[in-house]
Design a protein with these regions (language model features):
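Inward-facing hydrophobic residues that define packing positions of alpha-helical scaffold repeats
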Residues: 108, 187, 194, 260, ...
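Membrane-proximal, proline-rich intrinsically disordered regions
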Residues: 19-71, 267-268, 545-547, 551-576
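Elongated scaffold/linker segments in the mid-to-C-terminal portions of large proteins
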Residues: 46, 203, 265-438, 444-451, ...
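Bacterial Sec-dependent N-terminal signal peptides
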Residues: 1-30
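Conserved, well-structured interaction surfaces
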Residues: 43-44, 78-157, 174-188, 196-203, ...
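Short, surface-exposed recognition loops and adjoining beta-strand edges that mediate ligand/DNA contacts
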Residues: 33, 60-74, 163-165, 206-234, ...
């Protein structure tokens, strides 16, 4: 009989004095009867969710990146990690256990249930600040829950959905508690939660509210030193758009088009409006070339104009991840389990800021090739993030600005806007329209403008950055990468020919696979690239070769890899 593994429903007690806010003490926890008994414990309960996020933060990296194109195991690697790399059975492999994601979901459900119980118990008699914060805490918990299910879906292809707070073992066969979902079902359930929120604490709470922790620390004017806390929760737009892009794989043409239209309109609007914040927030500009290492080489805020949700750690407070241990050849204990594969490095040009020549993502340390972007930088002779290597606990990004550009290009492609998609992927609007032309092409397709007005919002804020900022130079351009030679059609073609080309399935697939190839270059060691290939395989007739053709080069003998992928490319795990 299948049972869901039991997760202790205890929020870790977190210190509240300034920088001790995230201090954990595993021997001093709130038991079920005490949690939540007063307003201050609302915040402690929510930070219990963050503790679960810290536990899940590096899970996808070590589970999926060894199966993607970039990483290979070293002779030091544990046997279980080597087995993942060799595409042997994942069922029962310790790295493949989905426990961290279910623990997070349990924590979110429990927090929301206990918060509602507390609200009912005090009959809504709360301080003014609590009345403001409760909806934002619930909204944040909803997004953490959705992120947990999103990760389960993209890694395992299935999940058990439940909304109750688990206090004891329960049979997975109990359909009154659990609903087993495939990836389409996960997308549907998560999107419904993101769109409609939840009825809790006497009100309908949407899923897109943000908690401003700076004003919780200092209600009188905020405290900028704690601004990075606002990045603890993934953004609504990232989750909603990612899930929609996956859902299109399983929909009919009309429904898929509606989802692509949603992604295009909402991501484009979000990106354009974000430029108001500083001229280049979440954009692909020259600024990325200058600041790219700072997205990763950090233990705190990272490069804030690019980060859209992250997991933070603090060695002094015993909050640790395994990144440096697994990637660094000079780690002063057992470690250095994964390194860049030589064949993977061949896909980068010499100028590409992510390639081996530039030494911003990988480097030679202690005489060994190392994946170094999280903990070491050659810029300004800075070297390691800390003098004591074992103390380095890098920030793990959940989403960043690049994610939205890939989603936008993907959506424009499927809507037939091939010129826009190609421009976003390659060298951007600034190069497509030299001089920042004031009028975008008026071309239309099926009565819709191909170039949305949001690419030119107004004279001070747009993708050309005429007010002195940096304009859009594309995903490839912002990394000094190699442009993709994609199919196009002549301006002299007839309208009928242009229409047919726009919706040609082979053209759309060619553009999608170019995005996938660039995605592999961009998201190394972030627990994302393998799942992106799986998304494309699902989209195009469950074609395992989309994955296989991109990972096989690093293997001397790829026969086991092909056999495994042919059987199943989602990670296999049997819940008991």
């Amino acid at each position: 009989m299948k049972k869901l593994f039991y997760m202790p429903l205890l929020a870790v007690l977190l210190g509240f004095a300034s920088c001790q806010f995230f201090e954990t003490d595993p021997d001093n926890v709130l038991n079920e009867d005490q949690y939540i008994a007063k307003e201050s414990e609302m915040y402690r309960g929510f930070l219990g969710i963050i503790t679960r996020m810290q536990e899940a933060g590096d899970h996808a990296i070590f589970l999926t990146d060894p199966r993607s194109n970039y990483m290979e195991t070293t002779g030091n690697a544990p046997i279980a990690l080597q087995n993942l790399y060799r595409y042997e059975s994942t069922d029962g492999n310790e790295y493949a256990d989905p426990r961290p994601y279910y623990a997070l979901i349990v924590s979110c459900n429990d927090f929301m249930t206990k918060l509602d119980d507390f609200y009912q118990r005090v009959d809504g008699a709360l301080s003014d600040s609590a009345k403001v914060h409760i909806p934002r805490l619930v909204s944040s918990a909803l997004r953490h829950k959705v992120w947990g299910y999103y990760m389960l879906g993209r890694i395992y292809g299935e999940a058990y959905w439940y909304d109750t707070n688990m206090t004891e073992l329960d049979n997975l066969d109990n359909d009154k508690v659990f609903t087993k979902l495939d990836m389409k079902g996960i997308c549907d359930y998560c999107i419904d939660l993101l769109d409609n929120g939840v009825e809790l604490c006497g009100q309908r709470i949407p899923a897109n509210l943000e908690m401003d922790w700076t004003y919780w620390v200092n209600p009188m004017g905020g405290n900028a030193a704690y601004k990075y806390w606002n990045l603890m929760t993934p953004r609504w737009i990232n989750l909603r758009a990612e899930l929609a892009s996956w859902r299109t794989n399983y929909e009919d043409e009309a429904a898929a088009r509606a989802d692509w239209q949603w992604v295009r309109d909402n991501v484009l609007r979000y990106l354009t409006e974000s430029m108001v914040n500083g001229g280049h927030w979440y954009s692909c500009t020259m600024q990325i070339i200058l600041e790219y290492p700072n997205i990763f080489w950090t233990e705190q805020v990272a490069y804030e104009p690019q980060i859209m949700g992250a997991v933070f750690y603090d060695y002094q407070n015993k909050q640790t991840n395994r990144l440096v241990q697994y990637f660094c050849p000079e780690y002063p204990a057992d470690g250095y389990y994964l390194k860049p594969a030589e064949k993977a490095l061949e896909i980068y040009t010499e100028a590409d800021i992510r390639g081996p020549k530039q030494r911003l993502v990988c480097n030679t340390l202690g005489g060994q090739l190392a994946f170094s972007k999280y903990y070491y930088t050659r810029l300004n002779n800075q070297g390691y993030l800390r003098q004591n290597i074992f103390e380095i606990q890098p920030t793990i990004p959940l989403f960043r600005g690049h994610d939205l550009h890939f989603l936008l290009a993907e959506a424009e492609n499927h809507l037939g806007h091939w010129d826009v998609a190609k421009t976003l992927l390659n060298t951007g609007l600034l190069n497509r329209f030299p001089g920042g032309r004031l009028t975008l092409p008026a071309d239309s397709l099926d009565g819709q403008a191909i170039w949305s007005e949001y690419y030119w919002a107004d004279e001070s804020v747009n993708w050309f950055a005429p007010a002195g900022g940096y304009g859009d130079i594309g995903i490839v351009g912002a990394n000094r990468g190699k442009e993709y030679d994609l199919p196009v059609i002549s301006d002299d073609a007839t309208d009928a020919e242009k229409l047919a080309f726009a919706y040609d399935k082979d053209r759309i697939k060619a553009y999608d696979l170019a995005l996938a190839d660039e995605y592999l270059k961009e998201f190394t060691g972030e627990g994302k690239s393998y799942s992106y290939l799986v998304k494309m395989a699902e989209r195009y007739g469950k074609d395992y070769k989309i994955v296989f053709d991109r990972v096989k080069a690093k293997y001397a003998d790829a026969s086991q890899v092909e056999a495994s992928l042919q059987e199943k490319y989602f990670i296999d795990w049997t819940l008991e």
